[in-house]
Amino acid sequence: MRKKKKSLTEVSALGQYIPMSVHKARRVIDQIRGRSYKETLMILELMPYRACYPIFKIIYSAAANAKHNKGFEKEDLLVWKAEVNKGPTRKKLKPRARGRSYLIKKPTCHISVVLKDISYYEAYETLYNREKYLPSNFRLKSSGAIWDKK
């Protein structure tokens, strides 16, 4: 098993065995991926889905980890990675008439969120003019490339 390399700017939180369908959790996770921490909290508070509350708690926990463990400011955090994986299915028996029983399946999921501190990258961009260091084929401003034509 390969060991994950620790990043200096990333903080993660993991919620396991959350009693919820993977599809319902992914519907919410897809809305918040790539957004800032504050914007994510506002979106989760206003969305009318039951999946929002556990995801809200996980993101809040990741931000608390960032503040406590690495000393990051919450305003500089960005939802870098967010994924939902399928967990084990809990099975229950529901009693029915004439001594029969029906199987009820309760799905679970694992949610992992990685927050990244972008203040480091903003300082890098102000220090170095990034366009100067890009290769010539990346500069598309009026270069006559296909992007200039409509």
Curated annotation (Swiss-Prot):
GO terms for molecular function: rRNA binding; structural constituent of ribosome. GO terms for biological process: translation. It holds the Pfam family Ribosomal_L22. It is found in: Plastid, Chloroplast. It comes from the Eukaryota. GO terms for cellular component: chloroplast; large ribosomal subunit. CDD domains: Ribosomal_L22. Part of the 50S ribosomal subunit. Belongs to the universal ribosomal protein uL22 family. This is Large ribosomal subunit protein uL22c. It comes from Fagopyrum esculentum subsp. ancestrale (Wild buckwheat). The gene is rpl22.
